[in-house]
Amino acid sequence: MKVLEGSVAAPNAKVAVAIARFNSFINESLLEGAIDALKRIGQVKDENITIVRTPGAYELPLVARRLAESKKFDAIVALGTVIRGGTAHFEYVAGEASSGLGKVAMDAEIPVAFGVLTTENIEQAIERAGTKAGNKGAEAALTALEMVNLIQQIDAA
């Protein structure tokens, strides 16, 4: 029986990190976690990491699509924070960011790791950006690297 499973060490991977500026006080912690994970655990070199800043989470799918179409990257990590408010805006932004990023991954056949927090309140966002609930930016970065390695294994099988 053959079992394929990716590892997180990917020293030659070229990774784009698309990060929303809106809610930057949370997103910068996600970015720090992602970069730390890429470099320390994934062993990705500085010169192989590109950071692209978007106005908000809604814009992440278009930027991810352009990054994927450039064929310069092995994976994309999308980071942002959408916090529920008193209107339906949350559902629109969170839903479009999620489905749009998933579509990019499927259409471009490149790992697009979803590191967009969708929380009920700011406390939940803070917990997921490096406190009680870990750092979801770091988790997304490691997911991206694992998928890069897994896809390479599938292609070689």
Curated annotation (Swiss-Prot):
Supply the EC number(s). Answer: 2.5.1.78
* Annotated pathway: Cofactor biosynthesis; riboflavin biosynthesis; riboflavin from 2-hydroxy-3-oxobutyl phosphate and 5-amino-6-(D-ribitylamino)uracil: step 1/2
The domain of life for this entry's organism is Bacteria
Pfam families cross-referenced by the UniProt entry: DMRL_synthase
Q: What class of enzyme is it?
A: transferase
Function text: Catalyzes the formation of 6,7-dimethyl-8-ribityllumazine by condensation of 5-amino-6-(D-ribitylamino)uracil with 3,4-dihydroxy-2-butanone 4-phosphate. This is the penultimate step in the biosynthesis of riboflavin.
- UniProt-recorded name of the protein: 6,7-dimethyl-8-ribityllumazine synthase
Which organism is this protein's natural source? Haemophilus influenzae (strain PittEE)
Q: What is the lineage of its organism?
A: Bacteria, Pseudomonadati, Pseudomonadota, Gammaproteobacteria, Pasteurellales
